[in-house]
Every structure is written in C-alpha cells, then in structure tokens.
From Swiss-Prot:
GO terms for molecular function: DNA binding; DNA-binding transcription factor activity; pyridoxal phosphate binding; transaminase activity. It comes from the Bacteria. In the C-terminal section; belongs to the class-I pyridoxal-phosphate-dependent aminotransferase family. This is HTH-type transcriptional regulator NorG. Keywords: Activator, Aminotransferase, DNA-binding, Pyridoxal phosphate, Repressor, Transcription, Transcription regulation, Transferase. GO terms for biological process: alpha-amino acid metabolic process; biosynthetic process. The gene is norG. InterPro entries: Aminotransferase_I/II_large (IPR004839), Class-I_PLP-dep_aminotransf (IPR050859), PyrdxlP-dep_Trfase (IPR015424), PyrdxlP-dep_Trfase_major (IPR015421), PyrdxlP-dep_Trfase_small (IPR015422), Tscrpt_reg_HTH_GntR (IPR000524), WH-like_DNA-bd_sf (IPR036388), WH_DNA-bd_sf (IPR036390).
Length: 442
C-alpha cells in the first residue's frame, strides 16, 4: 500500500514537514515501510495478515519433511481424545503401565538429584543406562560394549538419526511391508527409494537386492518380531538368511526390535544375535513396555557408527532427557522392570485371547487373521470386497470408534490393525461388534 506524500501527510496531521520526514525515516529504519526511488513510499506487505498466511503456506511447500497421509493426520489428532474408542492404538492402556514402579524409580532418582549435572548431556546418553543395557543384551546373546550403545528418544528417533547421519540422501531402503514405517515419512524426507518386500515373502530379499547391485547406498530395514501392524515374526531360518544376504552384498541391516520383551511363549533370538561382522544396527525402546511418554530407546551398532551418530546428535538436540534415562535405569537396576514384564505378558496374552475369541465368533466367515505370539496387534484381513476408507469414516463419525486401516501401512489388502493393548475388554468387545455390524451393512 502506497502512503501519501510528505506534503499531504503534513496537511492531514497539521504538523511540520520536517516532523513527517523524521517519522518516515524512523518507520523505514524499523522496516515498517520502504521507499522506491521515483515511485513513492509503501507499507511493507508483511504487515498484511493475508500476505503472511500465504507466505507461510508457500514456505511450507519448500519443506524437506513431507506431511503425513491425511488419514494418519486425522488419526494423530483424534488419538488423544478419550471420548473415542481406540481399537487400533499402538500403546499400553493406563492400567497396564507400571505406575508404582515408575513412582519408586522417580523417588530414587530425586533422592540424589543434587548430584546431577543439569548441563547439556553428551550425544551418547547416560553411562549407567548404557552399561545396564549392555548387560541385558549380553543375556540375549549379543556381546557389545558401552561404546556400541547410544540412547535415543525412542525407536523412531533412532531411525531418523540413522537416516540423517548414516544412510545419507537418495539411499535405497529395502523393507518389509506392511509396516508402521509406511505411516511415517521418515525415509522419504531424504528422497530415499523405498523397495517393499511382503512380510510373507521375506526370502525374496536376495532377488530384489540383485536388481540394485550397482547402487552402493542401500540398507535393509526389518521388524523381526511381532511386526507392527501384522503381529508376524520371522523364523530363525529367515533371520539367518537375511544375515547371509547382508554379508554377501555388504548391506547393513536396520533391525527394529521394539516388541522384543512382549512375548507370550519362548523368546526367539534377534537378528543381531547372528551378526558376526557388525552388519546389523539394532534398535529397541522402552516406549512399548513402560510408557510412550518416557521417550527412551537405544541403538546398538559398531563403535564408528555410534560415534558418527553422537556427533550428528549434538548438532540436533544435545541428547535425550537425562531424568528419563535415570528413571529407566533405576527400574532396570532394582529389577522392577522385569517384574513388570512378567505381569504385562500375562495380561496382554489374556487380552489377546479375549479378542481372538470374539473374532472367532463374529468374523470367521468374512475375514482371516493370524494368532500373534507377542506384541500388541491382530491383523484383520477381510475376505469380502469392502471399502476400508468408507468403513473408517463411518465408524469414526457415527460410532466414535477409531480404527487404523491397513492402507496407511502400505497394505493393498482390505485390512485393519486391531490392538488388544490399549482399550478395556468391554470396549474391545463393543468396538468389534460395531465393526462387524458395519461390515455386514456394506
């Protein structure tokens, strides 16, 4: 917007022209107006609200981080609304979280908090927590040292760090599908090329790798146990085969093992257990066993990789919360975490069986599923032709039931991720009956 001339302003406000000139010089110095030689003086556009909004929208289009799928955005918005039934939610219900153990661990942490430095932490994480993770990994057949462990703010944060600090731009990621990683844009932000391998065809990895043999920058991403969303696990033979592929083609493996501690029968070894050449980068987390808000996970890798990631980390966020790390350490040290796990496995197995019983009664003629031996999820695949997107919106808008449709995980099947971990048995039963009713209508 152009402002009037000095003479017009002096007449309008009944002041001397010198006053107008000084005022304009001051406003120009502050950036509120600007002068075009031979044209006049103008108000800066950034004071215009519509211009600001349009400019921000334009700048967001330049972002290297893509927006989530619309369905995922909607799920993320509603997931914290307690008025909905969250039959697909990927976290523990409040009653399953170790409240008493957490309180005790926090109290123990607080008792020596004056000895704690509240300065910036290093990129590696709390030494005592790293050491106790090393001990626990050793009991699983993974022999590493403190220098091989880095604490992160959860598993997804670990994957983000690896994407930035290890893989680099334009990498090829060979990953199992369906996978929760498809509901994020963690690999897409650096223009990674995503090659999907169906979880039930994991032995096809070798053939797929051969197609990209000339591409140097590539990695395998795999969830070996209780895959999110299907609940499936690899056999020990499949794990060994993946290691063989990795060694043959000199390709690193990113092993996302966040459900490792939630097993309902004898635990199986991780892929890292078979790793003799340091090809496997192992990721895990306490978010699925303690609480998401604790935001503590870890990476196990070669010393050189950990050193590189720690340096990148210091450029981004200076490390995870030292208080959260100390609380988790206290739970591990006093064994309350392991006692909690025993109870958690028992309760989750019971809730899984409750859900499976209802599925057998209602869905056996119209859908199929597998029995997970751990984790949170049952993968419901419909035998009939049904519009899953329509079902999602109908249940959301009319019944306040939130489901996670399979397509957000890269599945082409007519599928839903069901969770027995978050809701009460009463709500699980109610939600499944409503889903059945709407499916029959469709």
């Amino acid at each position: 917007m152009k402002i009037p001339s000095h003479r017009q302003l002096a007449i309008q406000y009944n002041v001397n022209r010198v006053t107008i000139i000084k005022s304009i010089e001051l406003l120009e110095a502050e950036g509120f107006i600007y002068t075009k030689v031979g044209s006049g003086t103008y108000v800066n556009d950034y004071l215009n609200e519509a211009h600001i909004t349009n400019k921000w929208s334009e700048m967001m289009l330049w972002s290297s981080q893509q927006r989530s799928q619309y369905t995922v955005q909607l799920i993320n918005k509603i997931e914290t609304d307690d008025s909905y039934i969250h039959i697909s939610k990927g976290e523990l219900g409040i009653s399953l979280m170790p409240h008493i153990q957490l309180k005790k661990a926090m109290s123990n942490t607080a008792s020596h908090i004056e000895d704690l430095s509240f300065g910036y932490n290093n990129g590696y994480g709390y030494i005592k927590l790293r050491d106790i993770i090393v001990e626990r990994m050793s009991k699983q057949g993974i022999n590493v040292g403190r220098e091989n462990v880095m604490i992160t703010s959860g598993a997804l944060h670990a994957i983000q760090l690896l994407s930035i600090g290890f893989l680099g731009q334009d990498a090829i990621i060979i990953s199992n599908t369906p996978s929760y990683i498809h509901s994020t844009n963690v690999f897409e932000q650096l223009n990674f090329r995503h090659i999907d391998v169906p979880y039930n065809q994991i032995n096809e990895i070798d053939t797929i790798i051969d197609r990209f043999i000339n591409f140097k920058n590539k990695a395998i991403y795999i969830e070996p146990r209780f895959n999110n969303p299907t609940g499936r696990s690899l056999t020990n033979e499949q794990k060994k085969n993946i290691i063989t592929y990795s060694e043959r083609h000199n390709i690193p493996i990113i092993e996302d093992d966040i459900f490792r501690d939630i097993f309902f029968s004898d635990p199986t070894p991780s892929i890292k257990t078979y790793d003799k050449l340091g090809k496997v980068i192992h990721i895990s987390s306490f978010s699925k066993t303690i609480a998401p808000a604790i935001r503590i996970g870890w990476i196990v890798a070669s010393e050189k990789i950990i050193e590189q990631l720690a340096d990148v980390r210091m450029q981004i966020d200076y490390g995870s919360s030292i208080l959260s790390q100390m609380v988790v350490y206290e739970m591990l040290k006093n064994k309350s975490y392991d006692k909690h796990l025993v109870k958690l496995r028992y309760v989750l197995k019971d809730k899984r069986d409750f859900m499976l019983n209802i599925l057998n009664n209602l869905f056996k003629d119209i859908a199929h599923w597998e029995v997970p031996s751990g984790g949170y999820f049952v993968w419901l695949v419909f035998k009939i032709d049904i519009d899953i997107k329509y079902l999602f919106y109908e249940l959301l808008s009319k019944e306040k039931i939130l489901i996670n449709p399979g397509y957000i995980y890269g599945s082409k099947e007519k599928s839903i991720r069901l969770s027995f971990a978050f809701e009460s048995n009463e709500n699980i039963k109610h939600a499944l009956y409503k889903i059945y009713t709407y499916v029959k209508k469709v």
